[in-house]
């Protein structure tokens, strides 16, 4: 009896990968049939297998035209291929176009709320920990220690959620003479690290999809990796040679610098009318506490009385007349939600923190869903090609530097690197922007945020203008030096490889992202700060063995992956150590059991195979039953 494929004249091999809960052992087809169709075809047998995700199979020359395919029961894509849908009517087409056009203003509205929620989030952190940040800055004996100064910069920037605020405080302390330029440089480095926590938090909102989360977390942590690597090289160099102090001193001495105005409000012109209705802060309280003015110790950060908006005085008005006019100006009550509540700063800060996080998460989720629906098919391909395509040869190398200029310009417009990097993080998660393109954009954002400190320094008194401008330039040259270290040559772009490794780890163990945030921005800085307070002897005694152990582990890992033959047999893997010392699997089991204790028990289902990730698949070995490499029999969850 002739089989179905023989009656058709032979099998037609389909190059498409198939998804699976059924195993097809029989002839291949020109299209992908469903299980119901296969059951009606004589000579074709299906076997149920446990599989939850696609397994891409390459074509193999099998005898009798037999191939192996796996697919889901009645997936939507296969159903569309089996039955041809009628052409949509004109009214349906118009409805689809109208829906897409309506999504654009909605998306812009959610983006506006997203940026406003970041501003309110910064205000919430300042209310909750602003005075603590001022107290930390006040102790000059601590700040004279470079390592302690670095940690102070990290913690203060995490507390106030704004590197612009922390660097402006540092510039104010330098201009008032309370802090030397050499002592302020490590704090500037720490503020650069602390500002990257915002977009890492934003990346957590895409944890629902492992692939999107892997890309988004890698795109967010590439900023962290760049800052940490730059500090590991430049902080010891600065402590030993004073490189940044001397270079910026020469630059300041060679220019005739005059005072200017504060940073221009570009994006705030749009966001402030809304955020001022929620909360208004008197940020001079934090700066006054930092410079040692105890008169404002018990003063609330919440602004109660505001000066009415008036037209700017003419430039011909004398200084005495201007001061007199300000003295005679009547103050009026501010117009925001918390002006008459009488709540303490901490309570208002916690309320705003919870509310801004809810709005932030909601806007981000809706933005991602709308971008997913808009960026489909040819539209997504065009955008990806435009953003990720390099310039034609021989100007390919210019593409990254052009992206830096774009990132710096956009950050100058929004006056916040956190806003810019948080805005591109969802696009990285969706795959619209590649990590290789996001890296120079982030570096440009690092440069763009230094303009805030430079413009704040230009507003300093004339007698302290040079020192204030010098510390602002230290911020600029620190980022330029980091770019020269970790960007020009492809082999030096370690932050990209480190970020991708972190992304893969968090895609496998999603709780690792929260652990990363706690360790890198809270526990590790606090531990280093405590050790540094015990003196340089304790710092050297603890830091030297730890640094040597870390260097040894990194070296062995590199040799294990590239040339294991150069290592002793027992050191070619970490299996000689207890499992918890070289794998997160035991901790993952504990966390899984702890979370399942609070979950409602579900009906028991057949046991699924363990999660296997592509990068952890064993070397290909022949399968005795199918005569195919083992990779093609694995199921990736």
UniProtKB/Swiss-Prot annotation:
Signal peptide: none
Source lineage: Eukaryota, Metazoa, Chordata, Craniata, Vertebrata
Superkingdom: Eukaryota
Pfam families assigned: Na_Pi_cotrans
Residue spans, topological domain Cytoplasmic: 1-103, 164-216, 369-410, 486-511, 560-637
Location relative to the cell: Apical cell membrane; Cell membrane
GO annotations of cellular component type: apical plasma membrane; basolateral plasma membrane; brush border; brush border membrane; cell surface; cytosol; endosome; mitotic spindle
Family, per entry: Belongs to the SLC34A transporter family.
Extracellular side: 126-145, 237-345, 435-464, 533-537
Disulphide bonds in the chain: 225-520, 306-334
Residues found modified as Phosphothreonine: 506, 621
GO molecular function, one term: PDZ domain binding
Tissues showing expression: Kidney.
Regulation: Transport activity is significantly increased in response to dietary phosphate deprivation.
Protein name: Sodium-dependent phosphate transport protein 2A
Organism: Rattus norvegicus
């Amino acid at each position: 009896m002739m089989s179905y494929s023989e009656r058709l004249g032979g099998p037609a091999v389909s190059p498409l990968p198939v998804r699976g809960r059924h195993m097809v052992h029989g002839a291949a087809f020109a299209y992908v049939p469903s299980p119901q169709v296969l059951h009606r075809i004589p000579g074709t047998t299906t076997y149920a297998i446990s599989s939850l995700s696609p397994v891409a199979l390459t074509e193999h020359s099998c005898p009798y035209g037999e191939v192996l395919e796996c697919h889901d029961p009645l997936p939507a894509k296969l159903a569309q291929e089996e039955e041809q849908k009628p052409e949509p009517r004109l009214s349906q087409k118009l409805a689809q176009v109208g829906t897409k056009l309506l999504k654009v203003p909605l998306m812009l509205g959610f983006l506006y709320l997203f940026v406003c929620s970041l501003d309110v989030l910064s205000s919430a952190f300042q209310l909750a920990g602003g005075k603590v940040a001022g107290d930390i800055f006040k102790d000059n004996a601590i700040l004279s220690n470079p390592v302690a100064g670095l940690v102070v910069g990290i913690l203060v920037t995490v507390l106030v959620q704004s590197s612009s605020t922390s660097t402006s405080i540092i510039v104010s302390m330098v201009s008032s003479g309370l802090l030397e330029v050499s002592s302020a440089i490590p704090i500037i480095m720490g503020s650069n690290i602390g500002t990257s926590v915002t977009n890492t938090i934003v990346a957590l909102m895409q944890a629902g999809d492992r692939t999107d989360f892997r890309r988004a977390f890698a795109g967010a942590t590439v900023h962290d990796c760049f800052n940490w690597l730059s500090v590991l090289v430049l902080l010891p160099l600065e402590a030993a040679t004073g490189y940044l102090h001397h270079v910026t001193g020469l630059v300041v001495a060679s220019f005739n610098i005059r005072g200017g105005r504060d940073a221009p409000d570009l994006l705030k012109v749009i966001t402030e009318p809304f955020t001022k209705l929620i909360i208004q802060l008197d940020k001079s309280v934090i700066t006054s506490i930092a410079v040692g003015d105890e008169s404002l110790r018990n003063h609330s950060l919440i602004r109660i009385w505001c000066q009415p908006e008036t037209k700017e005085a003419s430039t011909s008005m004398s200084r005495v007349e201007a001061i007199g006019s300000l003295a005679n100006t009547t103050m009026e009550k501010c117009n925001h939600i918390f002006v008459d509540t009488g709540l303490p700063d901490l309570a208002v800060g916690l309320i705003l923190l919870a509310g801004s996080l809810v709005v932030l998460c909601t806007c981000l989720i809706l933005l991602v869903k709308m971008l997913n629906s808009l960026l489909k098919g040819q539209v997504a391909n065009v955008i990806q090609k435009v953003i990720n395509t390099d310039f034609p040869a021989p100007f390919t190398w210019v593409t990254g530097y052009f992206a830096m200029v774009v990132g710096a310009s956009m950050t100058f417009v929004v006056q916040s690197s956190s806003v810019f990097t948080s805005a591109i993080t969802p696009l990285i998660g969706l795959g619209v922007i590649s990590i290789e393109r996001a890296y120079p954009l982030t570096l440009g954002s690092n440069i763009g945020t230094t303009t805030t400190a430079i413009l704040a320094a230009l507003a300093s008194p004339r007698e302290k203008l040079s020192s204030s401008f010098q510390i602002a330039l230290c911020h600029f040259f620190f980022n330029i030096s980091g770019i020269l270290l970790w960007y020009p040559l492809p082999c030096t772009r370690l932050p990209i490889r480190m970020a991708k490794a972190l992304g893969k780890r968090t895609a496998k163990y999603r709780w690792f992202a929260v652990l990363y945030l706690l360790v890198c921005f809270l526990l590790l800085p606090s531990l280093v700060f405590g050790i540094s307070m015990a003196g340089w002897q304790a710092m050297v005694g603890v830091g030297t063995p730890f640094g040597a152990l870390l260097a040894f582990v990194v070296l062995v890992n590199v040799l294990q992956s590239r040339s294991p033959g150069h290592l002793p047999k027992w050191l070619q893997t970490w299996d000689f150590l207890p499992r918890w010392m070289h794998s997160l699997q035991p901790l993952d089991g504990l966390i899984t059991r702890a979370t399942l204790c609070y979950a409602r028990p579900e009906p028991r289902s057949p046991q699924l195979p363990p999660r296997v990730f592509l990068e952890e698949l064993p070397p290909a070995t022949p399968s005795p039953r199918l005569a195919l490499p083992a990779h093609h029999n694995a199921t990736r969850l």
